[in-house]
Amino acid sequence: MTDYCIVIPSYKRHDIICSKTIQMLIDYHIPMDKVYVFVVKEEYGKYKSVLPNLCNIVIGVKGIDKQRDFIGSYFEDGQPLLSLDDDIVSLHQLDIENKTKTTPIKCLDTLVYETFFKLNSHELNLAGLYPVNNYYFLKDNDTIDLRFIIGQVKIYYNKKHLEKRQFYLLEDYETTLKYYLNDGGVLRLNNICINANIDTLKGGIEDRTLEKKKEEVARFKKKYDNYCEIKTKDNDIDIRLLKTPTLTTLTALWIGKVINPIVEVAWLSWLKQGYKVCVYISNLDKGKLHKSLRKFINNRLVFKNALKIMEFKTGEEILPFSDLWRYKFLAQEGGIWIDSDMILLDQLPHQEFIITTEHTFQSGGRRSKLTYKPNIGILKFNKNNDMLLRTIKRIEKYSLIDAPQFTDNMKLFQTELKKENYEKYYIEPNMTCGVPWWDFQELYEDKGIYTTKYNVDVKSKNWLLTNAFALHCWEHFTIGNKIDVVGCPPQSLFGTIRRQYH
């Protein structure tokens, strides 16, 4: 294992950091050249004047959420890190012989290396300590289910894509969940706690108001509804993570003996966003799946017979078949359908219905009056939905006259949508189909900015990775155009995402 580094984000604490966290590290005989203190530019001189000479002082950004993201970008993926707040006095563990008291940790180095060993044995990336400094609540055990990892002390392997933040006051809850979803667990050492002056010193999170906390808690609950509940006490409000959350199921279809690399990454992305995955298959050889997928089989990855929903006839066009298949599945079972070339980058929105969309031509002979139109990449509908039943009926009626081609069945679905008030459930195209089909090749090229065609501006690679919750990879076009998706540049959009999930 590469030796770990110690990272300390600090803001307006130059006058206490040396007497708190730095002094603790000195007491543990930690070499200062492995310590990195992240500060804002305006305070660099103040920290430089008080910190030990060998200590690394890095100019970062303001705001703990943005600073965490900056730290993640500063180090390589997989770099072992020990993150410490700047106000830590000491670390304590439950006394094995007398469990009515705690004793100071004897060797920090030993604690860190033993924790990384435990992470490796559980195939996890994030570990933390018990969040309350009270022997009464400590337990002489470790857990790997969903439990809060407080940001004061974290031992982890850096994952750049998991260090991006959308929350400020709840950033450590967000971190806990992102690593939990990606790995299937987080390691918490329930016999060790932290002695620090949390929420009482100047600096740190400056604008911690009740109103802002309420707003973040509500937004967090909406985003991660299955994984948490809101708790209130006196004049405070907070989040409580659920140890055994109820997982949402995504359903897909695959006809064929093997899956391709795009589908492999897509299925992995669904699992690493914490979903159960049910794939209806015909002829798939599960033994040829990548080991990263096989470990989920019969746990969160299940397979069912696709022909129970609808029979696939030899020689039949696969696209119109799969379109009708999904309508029939949703009408019979209800739930969430997702295309097997749709990679998830974040959680799906919690709303009654989901209908994804794609860009339309805004110039040329095929110019559309609409800037986007509904598609069927991700769909969420209730069982026995009237609109779906009408769509199925129309498709089956027209198929008696002529065999459907390419997108015929999707067009009938779009026609039925217009008759209903479903527009409010449309997902803006950049959130799932940010790179249009006419630019699909650029997904697999070393580009950060994509070509504007047909007067449609395409968001940048960084924007999509930060803001979109899915990415349609246009697998059908890659096959027809013989795109080498495995050999594509690692810095391409697809290459970047593939590295994240593998």
Language model region names:
Residues 8-29, 43-49, 258-269:
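Short, well-formed alpha-helical segments that are part of the catalytic scaffolds
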